């Protein structure tokens, strides 16, 4: 599956890598791998989003951070991986 990072998602990911928080980076990588393998049946308590984010899903990184993503045409699009649907 091909990953497409939106600008914010990539900036979030680089921010996590630069933070020195290896545990969170490993968790993000594990979640992305699970999404690639299992789609919306992945780990991380996947939830469909509503409103202006309809069509997007989220999975929990930790108590306050989520990966916001969608699957389309064999692609994994990552909108963000920090914060909570901002």
Each language-model region and where it sits:
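Basic, Lys/Arg-enriched alpha-helical interface segments
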Residues: 1-65, 71-86
